[in-house]
Amino acid sequence: MTNSKAKNTGESQVAKRFILSAFLAAAGTTQAVEFENDIIEGNFDSTLSYGGSFRVDDPELSSIGRANGGTAYSVNGDDANLNYDSGLFSHVSKGTHDLELAFKELQEVSIFIRGTYFIDFENNRGDSPLSGSAKREVGREAEFLDAYVSYDLPSSVPVNIRFGNQVLSWGESTFIQNGINVINPIDVKKFRVPGSELREALRPVPLLSASVQLTDNLSLEGFYQFKHEEMEIDPAGSYFSTKDFVGAGGQYAMLGFGSLSQPNMSSWTDNPLAPFLDGVPAKLPTISNPRFNPALPPSAANAPFLPSNAGAIPRGKSNRASDSGQFGFAAHYFAEGLNDTEFGFYFLNYHSRLPVISAVTGRDIISELKPTFDALNGGIGQLKAGIGQVDTGLEQIAGGIVQVDAGLAQVNGAIAQLESTDPNNAGLAALKTEQATLTGQKQAFVAQQTGLTTQRAGLAAQLAGTEAQLSTLTASQSSLAQLYPGTARYIFEYPEDIQLYGISFNTEIGATGISVQGEVSYRNDVPLQVDDIELLIAGLTPSNPVLGNLGALNPAWNGVSMTQLGSQGFNSYVQGYRNFDVIQPQFTVTKLFGPTIGAEQWVLVGEVGATAVPDLPSKDKLRFDGPGTVLSGNAFAPQILAANGHATDRFESADSFADDFSWGYRLAARIDYMDVYGGVNLSPAVAFAHDVDGNTPLPLGNFLQDRKTVTVGVTATYQNSWQGSIKYTEYLGNESHNFMHDRDFLSAMVQYSF
């Protein structure tokens, strides 16, 4: 490679790492512990940190569902606000260690291992409101990250091969995600930890990767991935979570547009369907604080607790992607004749790292229970017939006993008379024989009577139990339809075989100190989320056909559906996504200033990007999910809701849903003041993100129109080992759909590297 190439590539990458570390990781330069013996040499880097984060203000009522005391039309995104008032929400000790080994006798081979761990004393406490699975994600964790073997192949051209868990970064993106750099999914929750570093948040994946430097100007790369890894999203109810039904701990999606709170996992009730249907749990968590749910029968509408499946759709088993079929190739060309510009060309075949939501409709409970009704009624008839037969037998036996008693009375009288008047009468013996015979007959009748009486009692008990079962089912017939949601489920899916084609560049503009880099990615068959409310309503059409055809409410609406997905059948799969081609250009400009305004240097970085989905249908054909939509986009929604008791509910405007084009920009700056006092360096920094226009379809979610984020902070560094920082983040704009708008926070940390 030429010096100009090294300079060009190095400065652009340094600028990227510099800004990312300033605002995402706050990492300092470490001085590794080096060691060696006769066989190996290596170094061991360690970074230990301690910090906390504080919520500035209490949550607003508009961020809390109506059933939980707020004004929001959903309880599916308010757990974080219920769990965290103003004050401390994270209190963390953390460590990350890097081990690098090289073999003296085999210099081509090296090993790299990275591990990290943390404990959040605030979220790991015993009385934390988080679920057990959510607490395991944000309360404490220890894991290995990178762990790979590197081999430099002895050849006429440099060839490097790596095998194991590793991070492979392609493309030229800086801040805006979902570009070319998709090989490694992100562990979002790691970014939330005070003192977090980028190296901890990128999830290494098991790869066989290779790179070859064919000439000074041309290099090739390739990889094959052995195991699919997914993006780790915020656990349900954690501070940065905005959806309670996704992530670790997310188990239910609630109906009722905010009128019912989530199931109370500490209070359980018998499942009335369990004795009669296979595949349903014996116990169910309850729903507390029912505000208003006209779909429930009047007797249950004001109950302090309701069965969870009266208003909650449970989460089903995820449909995960295959571990095979993911690979990619890249070529890099350094064009000295084009202003020392480096170009990159990329192809990847990969599976989605981001989840999309689909549904399986509920079971036809009434039809499924019909054989049970028939069997119970048939059983009752048979039991009653059996009791009737037993009663007939008892009547016959009772008649026989009466006849035997009459005969005994005559015989006993005759015996008594002879014994008193003629004791030696020859007929007395015959009378006593007849007396014994009649006594035996009576005893037999009594035994039969006892047996039949016991049999009748058993039949009567069976009849009472069967009639009780029938009574339970009959009494619940009016509400069986309301138990339907609990037999449905929503599922996460990770569609396969997304193909990405990309091109990138990076260069400098003369001697201006300005670096420019950018990329354009074209992806084929990207799964985009259909509006989840459309999916929800479609899932309810089997039990409420009027949602599929509004003509039953108003003849003028005949043929009009409440959902763009149309009517569905019972126990059927409803795909919640559609595949589209997605184009994403993004460009970054970096300006490195020398000594000025008393500072050693300062850096300004700006990135602008856009997401385009050329074939996305118009919103009157099919609406796709955008951040923060919690109501239907159907213009009929208010009238339908009013007819079903939700007179005050409204609907989402078309502007709320995903657009075919969206764009925004990111700005960041940092100033370095060296040796301010006693060898301490100070670096004030500011970052600004602005989503200018359009809403990016989920699960991509790059831009939400008019959303803004501002972060200001200062970092102090001492002897490249000690570092402390404090920063403040404010969320602004589009408050009705930006669920972070009231979660401004302050964080501080101290870090030691050695």
Segments from the language model and where they lie:
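Membrane-embedded beta-strand positions of outer-membrane beta-barrel proteins
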Residues: F44-S46, I113, I161-F163, A210, ...
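Short loop/turn motifs that connect adjacent beta-strands in outer-membrane beta-barrel proteins
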Residues: A32-F44, D57-P59, L99-I111, S150-I161, ...
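Outer-membrane beta-barrel "beta-signal"
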Residues: D742-F754
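Flexible, surface-exposed loop regions and adjacent strand-edge segments
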Residues: L61-A67, S128-S133, N178-I183, H228, ...
